[in-house]
Amino acid sequence: MSENVMTLQVITPAGVVYDHHANYITARTTNGEIGILPNMISTIAGLEIDELKVRRPDDETHVDYIAVNGGIIEIKDSLVTIVADSAERNRDIDVSRAERAKIRAEKALEVAKAEKKSDEIKRVEVALHRALNRLNVSSHN
């Protein structure tokens, strides 16, 4: 493999979501956004609910977008592995389902706030964040 190429694998309990070569990856960790290049220093970090951007070596003008709902990222030599609870490529996102999830979460958030249930508010805010992330990533089609 070329020195300017790395392999990215995104894995969920349902299986491998993404397995391709890349020459640049952007991810949001719990400590902020990072840009990943081939042969970077080894790192392990927690991931936020956010989009993952992947620039592939076969078409540098094209970016693959993946909705990642938290997890961990490990960078070692020319292999980047992401293990996430769930992840979807932008082309695989069911937009109407994501819209319905957003509406459900917004309604549940109103109820939880009215009832002042702090644990429920946090849970529903995460669900809303996931739905908004999926909608944002799907807009890159």
Swiss-Prot record:
GO terms for molecular function: ATP binding; proton-transporting ATP synthase activity, rotational mechanism. CDD domains: F1-ATPase_delta. It comes from the Bacteria. It is a peripheral membrane protein. Keywords: ATP synthesis, Cell membrane, CF(1), Hydrogen ion transport, Ion transport, Membrane, Transport. GO terms for cellular component: plasma membrane; proton-transporting ATP synthase complex. Produces ATP from ADP in the presence of a proton gradient across the membrane. HAMAP family: ATP_synth_epsil_bac. F-type ATPases have 2 components, CF(1) - the catalytic core - and CF(0) - the membrane proton channel. CF(1) has five subunits: alpha(3), beta(3), gamma(1), delta(1), epsilon(1). CF(0) has three main subunits: a, b and c. This is ATP synthase epsilon chain. It comes from Lactococcus lactis subsp. cremoris (strain SK11). The lineage of its organism: Bacteria, Bacillati, Bacillota, Bacilli, Lactobacillales.
